[in-house]
Amino acid sequence: MREIKSGVVLSKMRKILLFLGVFFYVSQAIAVQDSLETEDRKTFEFIADSLNEMIFLGNNPDFRCKFYDKIDSFRTTGKGRINILHIGGSHVQADIFSHTVRCRIDSLNGEFKPSRGILFPYQVAKTNNPTNYKVTYAGEWKSSRNIKKDREAILGVTGMAVSTMDTIAEIRIKLNPKDSVGRWSFTRLKLLGYAEHPKVMPLLKLGNSSFLHPIYDSVASTYTYILSVPMDSLNLIISQTDTISHRFTLTGLLLENDEPGIVYHSIGVNGASVPSYLSCPNFERDLNLIRPDMVIFAIGINDAVPQNFSKNNFIANYDSLLSKFRKVSPECFFVFVSNNDSYRKIKRRYRRTRYQLNTNGVLAREAFAMLAEKHDGSLWDLFSIMGGLDSIKKWEESGLSQKDKVHFTKAGYTLVGNLFFEAFLNSYNNKD
């Protein structure tokens, strides 16, 4: 990391200690990175380590420089909030890749403990929930997803929603189910959603008979709960006070506190494509709650499945999505992740399902490079780093890819996350 020049004296001793603390954590991160690099490359020689970098392809480096300047400012002053948003499909919904990066980047926060960011209770929608937070629920809920044309709910930035009219409806979330240290907590909860009638209200249960009422913002369509002490779990009940039940819809939960540092948000929906997110009416409105400083775009694996995949249409769809981000965060830095190498499923009548190499990965990689150049962003070329066309077979043989040759195993996602963090850290270290 860049050292502070001699003669720079911070106004308070605490700031000096802060810098030393953050520098120690960053040094630790680099040491762990070196260890991982040695172990991973020895075991998996098919990984093109020389290509593991964030390649800046734009003409104007201002977005990139301003983002890294914000990290520098936080490191030296201990002030400021930096929001990173990682958006994609099933690779991100599983939250192994993204949570690996989240935890590695969290090491840069030093003594500070900013919040976990936005999340969705996937378990309530009866789909796979990340294992790093636990969700349980009561009552009947119906789900809506951005991959479906027929939806009961109006969707926002998460691309998901759950709705209920049940009088016993309840959602419980534990942020640190496997972490004895209890890293993640919040002092402010923003529930994204809406009610069809004033007499249905989400309440935060604090004890056996204690409930916290929210502050409702009709413009942002959020319910905000202010807590007096940090919490690492929540229990939401849907209160029905009318003689008949009314529908309530939840589209996301934003966990916040006032700690400075880097917050790593992740949004993913199984099967989602770029048009899936474009179809969410409240996407831009909800994005204002995050206002990302950097966005990691990892949408594309589903767009490239059809044999008639059009690179031009893919770029045009992305242009439309990126314009939404520019409206909300004009100085946001974009990082594009190329699709992993993959196979597509071929169904044959009266025959077993088989898989066929999807050569569209090459076209998608070209499209991501063009997007990075056009929008002054960087490319993290996962397709090439993992070995290029048909390399997914080697990943499967090594226990890093599932049999469908699309999704990774836990070990594979963790490796991808570590590779990404390594490229991110190297890009930051060599920014000058």
Predicted segments, located by residue:
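Loop/turn elements at helix/coil->beta-strand transitions in domains of secreted/extracellular proteins
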Residues: G80-N83, P260-V263, R291-M294, S329-F334, ...
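Catalytic His-Asp segment of secreted/periplasmic serine-dependent ester chemistry enzymes
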Residues: S342-D432
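Bacterial Sec-dependent N-terminal signal peptides
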Residues: M1-D40, D432
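Sec-dependent signal peptide cleavage junction
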Residues: A29-S73
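Conserved, well-ordered alpha-helix/loop/beta-strand core segments that scaffold catalytic motifs
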Residues: M294-G300, Y318-L322, F333-S338
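Active-site-proximal beta-strand/loop segments in catalytic clefts of secreted hydrolases
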Residues: I87-S90, S266-N270, F297-N302, V337-D341, ...
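Alpha-helical scaffolding within the catalytic cores
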Residues: N59-D72, Y277-L287, D319-L321
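Conserved SGNH/GDSL esterase-like catalytic core that processes O-acyl groups on lipids
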Residues: Q93-K205, H213-A316, H407
